[in-house]
């Protein structure tokens, strides 16, 4: 039975998948009893070579727990450890994954929303400053708190329904539209020629004038 049990529990035959030797009924029952004994904390079997049978049964039915793998390779990004360098490389590829187009568009939309929010805040601040700012008179440059006060003040600048600024602009336009009897593009005449021309023009005016006063001047 011992030889049959050793042949049945041979690790080389088990690893290579070799066919087990034929055993009879008594040997099979003995192997079953040995397996039951292994499950009860390795009690010794009765008979010659019982200790060897227990050790072989323990190796086959109660294998030693596998030693835990040492995690020597650690990711520098997230701190996870891996047993092999290949596993670490496969994990690091997830950190180098480029962002999807949806994420890019989402980030661009968020930036645009932030920019539009900043512009709206600036516009609201400028409009509030303009509405609460002083109202200044365009004539005397005085400032007033409200538009009604400015309108009441402007009444002092008006006489008979006309504005001082309008009258000043009208007088300036009239002065600029006055006709001058000389051309700036021509060379100036000598004083003798200019005096002779003026005297001649005066004589022609007196001759052609129908007024009696000028005729008396001609007779004199």
UniProtKB/Swiss-Prot annotation:
Keywords: DNA-binding, Metal-binding, Repeat, Stress response, Transcription, Transcription regulation, Zinc, Zinc-finger
Positions with biased composition (Low complexity): 107-117
Induction remark: Induced by abscisic acid (ABA) and hydrogen peroxide.
Record GO cellular component, one term: nucleus
GO biological process: regulation of DNA-templated transcription; response to oxidative stress; response to water deprivation
Zinc finger motifs (C2H2-type), residue ranges: 73-95, 135-157
Region Disordered: start-end pairs: 90-134
Gene3D superfamilies: Classic Zinc Finger (3.30.160.60)
Pfam families found in the cross-reference section: zf-C2H2_6
PANTHER family: C2H2 TYPE ZINC FINGER TRANSCRIPTION FACTOR FAMILY-RELATED, ZINC FINGER PROTEIN 36
Its biological purpose: Probable transcription factor involved in abscisic acid (ABA) signaling. Required for the regulation of the cross-talk between NADPH oxidase, hydrogen peroxide and MAP kinase in ABA signaling. Regulates the expression of the NADPH oxidase genes RBOHB and RBOHE, and the MAPK genes MPK1, MPK4, MPK5, MPK7 and MPK14. Regulates ABA-induced hydrogen peroxide production and antioxidant defense. Required for tolerance to water stress and oxidative stress.
Name under which the protein is recorded: Zinc finger protein 36
Organism: Oryza sativa subsp. japonica
